[in-house]
């Protein structure tokens, strides 16, 4: 099977083949040598406030993509930045009478607290804009030398002092501008291309955007080849990509709101310098709407992730965010979240049944093929989760049969395989759940048998066979002893009418 992904740049699905790797990797190939490397960059948050549900969707989606690539045998170098210098951070700092650094540090800590609850794996690197200034200077100077950027003296700087300059990117110098977003210059709204103020009087073209903006000496900023100032938003990511992953990466990802202007400008800044495509695959996730309207503070429907986590289980929220294909918009409603909460309860019951049936053996091969088929089609989580629900419900039915009627339709080894498939699918999608206490832990809590190691499935089967032999020999004292030993270790035995015995982990 071959993994295909939708590339925003080409507007079509393409076979996924990173620069250093094959398009399909078998388990034997992955185990036998160096795994192909995928270089992946995700645009991170601007750290001036708590994360909202749009952020949650973005980082759950790319966490899922990373996990699935690793499942398929790739090594993923995952980099996600923090924008820790920005006019919004400056405004928040002035409001609170704090430094920009203090504001940034606090909200970086809040970010990790929220994302940890969603079970999002940490990135390999978290570069920060303030720590990548030298790389920004090098890029801007290279763009100046190649004629793609120009400087304009800041008219507000006092005469006689060291001059300060704004530096702008000359959009019309790059003939492919608009290739990512599909927009043409004549269709674009002037001034819509950056977050550092774009109204500079010296701009040669209304479409040009800031690479560096001069700042008054009284404002936070940095010394640069162009005097005191702050970087433009877009140059920050271009510099951090190059500094951490090189000139040419496999995946550049983010929310659909970043396609234009942010990613369009990143591409335009980077490619004239390197002569190479910045990224082979550009991937973007859809918006979060609230009751059919785009989520925004102005509409009063803005929900922070912290508020949502106060109402719903983190894994129910993760389920809600993955039940819709990542490129489609998702509508947050109370009914949708209640459905996700009930769905997570069903999956938890399935997980519990899988744990009780035992986890020995390999996952059901048919289920895993179906999972890979769904996910190989541009990370099709709706199909993958539908399969997980089928497995969970089947395990619940079989568990109810065994509990109430003493038998199951499926043989024990098949139940264990289906349980293993459910757990592997959910783990690959990034879900987490409490692990069952091992026998020695339960015994220790009871003050009994504390030194016994956790029992493997094979050892349980061995003890069950010994008990069966004792019962046949009418050695009921020994049979009872084995039953009590297993009970203390969290194993329940169910004697069936045909003389066999089934077991469940508590």
Swiss-Prot record:
<feature type="binding site">
    <location>
        <position position="297"/>
    </location>
    <ligand>
        <name>ATP</name>
    </ligand>
</feature>
<comment type="subunit">
    <text>Monomer.</text>
</comment>
<feature type="binding site">
    <location>
        <position position="262"/>
    </location>
    <ligand>
        <name>Zn(2+)</name>
    </ligand>
</feature>
<dbReference type="Pfam" id="PF09190">
    <property type="entry name" value="DALR_2"/>
</dbReference>
<keyword id="KW-0547">Nucleotide-binding</keyword>
<dbReference type="InterPro" id="IPR032678">
    <property type="entry name" value="tRNA-synt_1_cat_dom"/>
</dbReference>
<dbReference type="GO" id="GO:0008270">
    <property type="term" value="F:zinc ion binding"/>
</dbReference>
<keyword id="KW-0436">Ligase</keyword>
<feature type="binding site">
    <location>
        <position position="266"/>
    </location>
    <ligand>
        <name>Zn(2+)</name>
    </ligand>
</feature>
<feature type="binding site">
    <location>
        <position position="43"/>
    </location>
    <ligand>
        <name>Zn(2+)</name>
    </ligand>
</feature>
<dbReference type="GO" id="GO:0004817">
    <property type="term" value="F:cysteine-tRNA ligase activity"/>
</dbReference>
<feature type="binding site">
    <location>
        <position position="237"/>
    </location>
    <ligand>
        <name>Zn(2+)</name>
    </ligand>
</feature>
<keyword id="KW-0030">Aminoacyl-tRNA synthetase</keyword>
<dbReference type="InterPro" id="IPR015803">
    <property type="entry name" value="Cys-tRNA-ligase"/>
</dbReference>
<dbReference type="GO" id="GO:0006423">
    <property type="term" value="P:cysteinyl-tRNA aminoacylation"/>
</dbReference>
<keyword id="KW-0648">Protein biosynthesis</keyword>
<keyword id="KW-0862">Zinc</keyword>
<dbReference type="GO" id="GO:0005829">
    <property type="term" value="C:cytosol"/>
</dbReference>
<keyword id="KW-0479">Metal-binding</keyword>
<keyword id="KW-0067">ATP-binding</keyword>
<dbReference type="InterPro" id="IPR009080">
    <property type="entry name" value="tRNAsynth_Ia_anticodon-bd"/>
</dbReference>
<dbReference type="Pfam" id="PF01406">
    <property type="entry name" value="tRNA-synt_1e"/>
</dbReference>
<feature type="short sequence motif" description="'HIGH' region">
    <location>
        <begin position="45"/>
        <end position="55"/>
    </location>
</feature>
<dbReference type="InterPro" id="IPR024909">
    <property type="entry name" value="Cys-tRNA/MSH_ligase"/>
</dbReference>
<dbReference type="InterPro" id="IPR015273">
    <property type="entry name" value="Cys-tRNA-synt_Ia_DALR"/>
</dbReference>
<dbReference type="InterPro" id="IPR014729">
    <property type="entry name" value="Rossmann-like_a/b/a_fold"/>
</dbReference>
<comment type="similarity">
    <text>Belongs to the class-I aminoacyl-tRNA synthetase family.</text>
</comment>
<keyword id="KW-0963">Cytoplasm</keyword>
<dbReference type="InterPro" id="IPR056411">
    <property type="entry name" value="CysS_C"/>
</dbReference>
<feature type="short sequence motif" description="'KMSKS' region">
    <location>
        <begin position="294"/>
        <end position="298"/>
    </location>
</feature>
<dbReference type="GO" id="GO:0005524">
    <property type="term" value="F:ATP binding"/>
</dbReference>
<protein>
    <recommendedName>
        <fullName>Cysteine--tRNA ligase</fullName>
        <ecNumber>6.1.1.16</ecNumber>
    </recommendedName>
</protein>
<dbReference type="Pfam" id="PF23493">
    <property type="entry name" value="CysS_C"/>
</dbReference>
């Amino acid at each position: 099977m071959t993994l295909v992904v939708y590339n925003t740049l080409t507007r079509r699905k393409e076979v996924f083949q990173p620069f250093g790797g094959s398009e399909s990797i078998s388990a034997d190939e992955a185990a036998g040598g160096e795994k192909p490397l995928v270089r992946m960059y995700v645009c991170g948050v601007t750290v001036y406030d708590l994360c909202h549900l749009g952020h949650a969707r973005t980082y759950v989606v790319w966490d899922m993509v990373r996990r699935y690539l690793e499942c398929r045998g790739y090594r993923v170098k995952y980099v996600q930045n923090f924008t820790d210098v920005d006019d919004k951070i400056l405004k928040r700092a002035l409001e609170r009478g704090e430094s920009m650094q203090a504001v940034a540090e606090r909200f970086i800590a809040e970010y990790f607290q929220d994302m940890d609850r969603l079970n999002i794996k940490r990135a390999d690197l978290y570069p920060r804009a303030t720590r990548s200034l030298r790389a920004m200077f090098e890029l801007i100077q290279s763009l100046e030398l190649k004629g793609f950027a120009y400087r304009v003296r800041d008219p507000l700087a006092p005469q006689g002092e060291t001059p300060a300059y704004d530096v702008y990117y000359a959009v019309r110098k790059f003939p492919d501008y608009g290739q990512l977003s599909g927009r043409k210059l004549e269709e674009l709204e002037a001034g819509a291309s950056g977050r550092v103020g774009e109204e500079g009087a010296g701009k040669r073209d209304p479409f040009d955007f800031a690479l560096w903006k001069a700042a008054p000496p009284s404002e936070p900023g940095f010394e640069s080849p162009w005097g005191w100032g702050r970087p433009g938003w877009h140059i920050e990511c271009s510099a951090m990509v190059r500094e951490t992953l090189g000139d040419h990466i496999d995946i550049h990802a983010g929310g659909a709101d970043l396609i234009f202007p942010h990613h369009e400008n990143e591409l335009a800044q980077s490619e004239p310098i390197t002569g190479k495509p910045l990224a082979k695959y550009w991937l973007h996730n859809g918006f979060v709407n609230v009751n059919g309207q785009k989520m925004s503070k102005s509409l009063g429907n803005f929900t922070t992730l912290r508020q949502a986590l106060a109402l719903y289980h983190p894994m129910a929220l993760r389920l809600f965010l993955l039940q819709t294909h990542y490129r489609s918009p998702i509508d947050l409603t109370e009914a949708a979240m209640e459905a996700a909460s009930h769905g997570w309860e069903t999956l938890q019951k399935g997980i519990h049944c899988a744990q009780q049936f035992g986890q020995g053996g390999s996952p059901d091969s048919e289920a895993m093929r179906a999972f890979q088929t769904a996910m190989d089609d541009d990370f099709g989580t709706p199909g993958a989760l539908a399969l997980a629900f089928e497995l969970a419900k089947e395990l619940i039915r079989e568990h109810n049969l065994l509990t109430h009627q003493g038998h199951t339709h499926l043989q024990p080894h098949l139940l264990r395989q289906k349980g293993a498939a459910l757990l592997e699918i959910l783990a690959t999608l990034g879900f987490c759940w409490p692990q069952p206490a091992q026998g020695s832990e339960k015994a220790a809590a009871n003050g009994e048998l504390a030194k016994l190691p956790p029992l493997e499935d094979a050892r349980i089967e061995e003890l069950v066979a010994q008990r069966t032999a004792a019962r046949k020999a009418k050695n009921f004292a020994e049979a009872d002893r084995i039953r009590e030993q297993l009970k203390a270790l969290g194993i329940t035995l169910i004697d069936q009418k045909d003389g066999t015995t089934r077991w469940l982990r508590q």
